[in-house]
């Protein structure tokens, strides 16, 4: 071969192959320019450059579409086929680097041959030659499609030239164009051998992995065939025994349902495992019944089924307003949640459905509000009553080892609704109890914790179940009996008692039309606002509207009976004066405060789970030895408030003109009427102090002012709870002036405007301010004075 330096030769672009030096290759040439290049080479010294295209899809490659390194080759033979294609045999002599292209009707370039460099490390090259030959032999043994004839294999085995070996192996191996081009572009022989060896070892690892996978697949196929064979045998045996065909059909149906159910993979595996156990049992055995029941539960509980949600907050607002009057805070919270869902719809946003806890007196609409939320969101609704539940298994279910075991109320509810995204109402969560069987409140921690409930595990199912899409709502009358860890999982929304105005609106626009329709008197019966107001004040005493609804129902039923006995024309209107004919004698007298000042009595305000109420506190001081008697079914906190008030008065005796030594010379009796009703809490502190000061000084107390506030030994007035309920009670009782702790001022925004405009609120920080407002000058002294100071007598 003559010494190649720089040559100007035709260029033959190659689409799907890389020709390496020291090899002879056949190339089909079909493109017009490529044919011209071959013909030009044949007409000259038969030399040309073979260069691979970067993109095989390019039909008319430009210089920039070709790699810079190719092969200098000699055309050994060319034959034209009937379709015009040239079949060319080329012998690759050496690597070549193309330097520049020359303008011509075909691709033509100036390039230079790249001679093989001398070996840098002959010993390393020798070792690499042996390793490459050994690896290539194993490569041929394991390759599924590559087959070399005896002469080709011998050429690889016998060569000791490292450069030739690297090119021959790369030529025969089924590597990508990019990998072969990398070998072509590697000038150093040792580096070239290393790359060839690395590619061979990579492929050998792949072959081993393929073998393992194939063996595993074959083993699985053999196992499936074996199971199929045994199953067919079992069918035949059962058929001979009689009665087995139905059982095997049932097994196949269960298997098909499991495959189609869309369970999570671990659940599916457990179901199939249980099905295999069932298959080996006698159809009528008790164990088979247990397995069937378990599989039925797994198949009937929803895993992926979901209702499409309505995420239009205008629709939701309309539905909530249709069903409930007022409850602004609750509705606002639901609309906030839906607004976020609407804005993030279709996005992967990590978030959880809120877990709301509605707290309020009976009859304010907590349960019905849950139904409205479900209706407004187009979700299915399920209610679970927790009142009196004392067994943990009611929540988590029983383990299958027990006879008659079933899942808990949560999983039963999910089966009932049939979707993974219902609204669940856990009613009366404050009335849970516990005993030796466990604490259901502790079991609810997992249900109501957004970080845990996506893997809730019922003891019966014994597989993780995702509750994260369930919208949980709980209801309670009071927070005091809910365990703190459970309460921490919930967003508490207080639903206070309704005002007289709200009750009148609810009765007028919601409950009365419903009761008239139920009685079949639409268009024949009406009721006045005065009648509704009288029912609220004299026939019911509640924070909600349940009894009001019951009384309205009585009126409608009584009118229906009257209509059947003696039909009337037009519309009958029920007025306040007619109520005794429909409802009988009033059950309550309106809660009215005393107007005249009293000695030894003070008007307090209290809050109960059923709403606010007036709390009159009486105090009497009689000659004695300093005993303090507290009556009226008082709790420990209220008794401590009484002692704190008494200590404050002792410390400020001179300021308020109290008898000297009264704590030793007089017995004090503090009483709170309605002794059958338990009372507790610190908010009666200033009321007790006022009643005691009045009893000890004989100064009357203004009874047209009600008060509430906790007292300290220093005479400070601390904030209290239930402000809205207490102000509603004062307003309903006809009191227009109320004393509140100054720190409660911010809570007035929760009180309806129509109530506030009728009230004069006095905010106080010290007990002294209270006593100055309430204590009037003492009455004229009696004609005959006793031997020692005599305090006023309590009312």
UniProtKB/Swiss-Prot annotation:
- Active-site residues? 683, 726
Q: Which GO terms describe its cellular component?
A: cytoplasm
> What does the UniProt entry say about where the protein is found?
Cytoplasm
Stored SMART domains = AAA (SM00382), LON (SM00464)
Q: Does the keyword RNA-binding apply?
A: no
EC number, as in UniProt: 3.4.21.53
Enzymatic reactions: Hydrolysis of proteins in presence of ATP
**InterPro entries, A to Z:** AAA+_ATPase, ATPase_AAA_core, Lon_bac, Lon_bac/euk-typ, Lon_lid, Lon_proteolytic, Lon_Prtase, Lon_prtase_N
Enumerate the spans annotated as Lon proteolytic domain: 596-777
Q: Which GO terms describe its biological process?
A: cellular response to heat; protein quality control for misfolded or incompletely synthesized proteins
UniProt keywords (A-Z) are: ATP-binding, Cytoplasm, Hydrolase, Nucleotide-binding, Protease, Serine protease, Stress response
Where does the Lon N-terminal domain start and stop, copy by copy? 9-204
User: What positions does the entry give for ATP binding?
Assistant: 360-367
Pfam families, alphabetically?
AAA (PF00004), Lon_C (PF05362), Lon_lid (PF22667), LON_substr_bdg (PF02190)
GO terms assigned for molecular function? ATP binding; ATP hydrolysis activity; ATP-dependent peptidase activity; sequence-specific DNA binding; serine-type endopeptidase activity
Instruction: Give the induction text.
Output: By heat shock.
Quaternary structure, from the entry: Homohexamer. Organized in a ring with a central cavity.
What is the documented function of this protein?
Answer: ATP-dependent serine protease that mediates the selective degradation of mutant and abnormal proteins as well as certain short-lived regulatory proteins. Required for cellular homeostasis and for survival from DNA damage and developmental changes induced by stress. Degrades polypeptides processively to yield small peptide fragments that are 5 to 10 amino acids long. Binds to DNA in a double-stranded, site-specific manner.
The record's HAMAP family line, in alphabetical order, gives:
lon_bact
**Family assignment?**
Belongs to the peptidase S16 family.
Q: What is this protein called?
A: Lon protease 1
Q: Give the encoding gene's name.
A: lon1
């Amino acid at each position: 071969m003559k010494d190649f330096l720089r040559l100007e030769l035709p260029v033959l672009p190659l689409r799907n192959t890389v020709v390496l030096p020291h090899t002879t290759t056949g190339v089909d040439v079909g493109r017009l320019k490529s044919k011209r290049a071959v013909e030009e080479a044949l007409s000259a010294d038969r030399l040309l450059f073979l260069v691979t295209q970067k993109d095989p899809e390019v039909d008319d490659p430009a210089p920039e579409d070709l790699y810079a390194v190719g092969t200098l080759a000699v055309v050994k033979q060319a034959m034209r086929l009937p379709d015009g294609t040239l079949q060319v045999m080329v012998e690759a002599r050496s690597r070549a680097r193309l330097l520049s292209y020359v303008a011509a009707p075909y691709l033509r370039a100036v390039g230079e041959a790249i001679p093989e460099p001398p070996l840098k490390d002959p010993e390393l090259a020798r070792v690499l030659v042996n390793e490459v030959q050994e690896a290539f032999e194993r490569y041929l043994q394991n390759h599924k499609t590559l087959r070399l004839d005896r002469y080709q294999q011998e050429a690889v085995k016998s060569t000791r030239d490292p450069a030739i070996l690297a090119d021959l192996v790369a030529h025969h191996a089924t590597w990508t164009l990019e990998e072969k081009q990398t070998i072509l572009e590697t000038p150093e022989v040792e580096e070239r051998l290393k790359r060839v060896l690395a590619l061979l070892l990579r492929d050998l690892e792949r072959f081993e992995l393929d073998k393992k996978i194939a063996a595993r697949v074959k083993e699985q196929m053999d196992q499936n065939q074996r199971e199929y064979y045994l199953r067919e045998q079992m069918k035949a045996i059962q058929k001979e025994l009689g009665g087995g065909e139905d059982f095997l059909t049932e097994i196949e149906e269960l298997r098909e349902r499991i495959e189609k159910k869309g369970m999570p993979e671990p659940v599916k595996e457990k179901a199939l495992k249980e099905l295999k156990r069932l298959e080996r049992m006698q159809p009528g055995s008790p164990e088979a019944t247990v397995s069937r029941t378990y599989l039925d539960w797994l198949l009937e509980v929803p895993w992926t089924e979901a209702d499409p949600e309505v995420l239009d907050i205008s629709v939701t607002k309309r539905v909530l307003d249709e069903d409930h009057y007022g409850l602004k805070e609750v509705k606002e919270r639901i609309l906030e949640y839906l607004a976020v869902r609407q804005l993030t719809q279709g996005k992967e946003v990590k978030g959880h459905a809120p877990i709301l806890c509605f707290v309020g007196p009976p009859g304010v609409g907590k349960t019905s509000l849950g139904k409205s939320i479900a209706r407004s969101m187009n979700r299915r609704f399920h209610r679970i009553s927790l009142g009196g539940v004392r067994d943990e298994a009611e929540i988590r279910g029983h383990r299958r080892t027990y006879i008659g075991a079933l899942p808990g109320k949560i999983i039963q509810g999910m089966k009932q609704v049939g979707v993974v995204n219902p609204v669940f109402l856990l009613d009366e969560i404050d009335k849970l109890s516990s005993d030796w069987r466990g604490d259901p409140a502790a079991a609810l921690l997992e249900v109501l914790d957004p970080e845990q409930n996506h893997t809730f595990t019922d003891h019966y199912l014994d597989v993780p179940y995702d509750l994260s899409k369930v919208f949980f709502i709980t209801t309670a009358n009071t927070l005091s009996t809910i365990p703190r860890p459970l309460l921490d999982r919930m967003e508490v929304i207080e639903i206070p008692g309704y005002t007289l105005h709200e009750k009148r609106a609810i009765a007028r626009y919601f409950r009365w039309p419903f009761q008239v329709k139920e009685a079949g008197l639409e268009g024949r019966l009406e009721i006045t606002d005065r009648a509704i107001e009288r029912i609220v004040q004299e026939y019911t005493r509640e924070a909600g509207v349940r009894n009001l609804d019951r009384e309205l129902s009585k009126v409608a039923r009584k009118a229906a009976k009257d209509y059947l006995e003696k039909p009337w024309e037009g519309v009958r209107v029920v007025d306040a004066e007619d109520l005794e004919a429909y409802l009988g004698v009033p059950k309550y007298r309106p809660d009215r405060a005393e107007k005249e000042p009293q000695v030894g009595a003070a008007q307090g305000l209290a809050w109960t789970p059923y709403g606010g109420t007036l709390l009159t506190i009486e105090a009497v001081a009689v000659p004695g030895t300093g005993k303090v008697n507290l009556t009226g079914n008082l709790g420990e906190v209220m008794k401590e408030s009484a002692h704190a008030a008494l200590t404050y008065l002792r410390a400020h005796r001179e300021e308020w003109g109290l008898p000297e030594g009264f704590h030793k010379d007089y017995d004090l009796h503090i009483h709170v009427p309605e002794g059958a009703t338990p009372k507790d809490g610190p908010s009666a502190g200033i009321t007790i102090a006022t009643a005691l000061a009045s009893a000890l000084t004989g100064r009357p107390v203004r009874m047209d002012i009600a008060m509430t506030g906790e007292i300290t030994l220093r005479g400070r007035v601390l904030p209290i709870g239930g402000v809205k309920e207490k102000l509603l009670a004062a307003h309903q009782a006809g009191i227009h002036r109320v004393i509140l702790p100054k720190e409660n001022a911010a809570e007035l925004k929760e009180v309806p405007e129509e109530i506030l405009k009728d009230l004069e609120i006095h905010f106080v920080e010290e007990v002294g301010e209270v006593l100055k407002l309430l204590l009037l000058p003492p009455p004229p002294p009696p004609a005959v004075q006793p031997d020692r100071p005599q305090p006023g007598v309590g009312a």
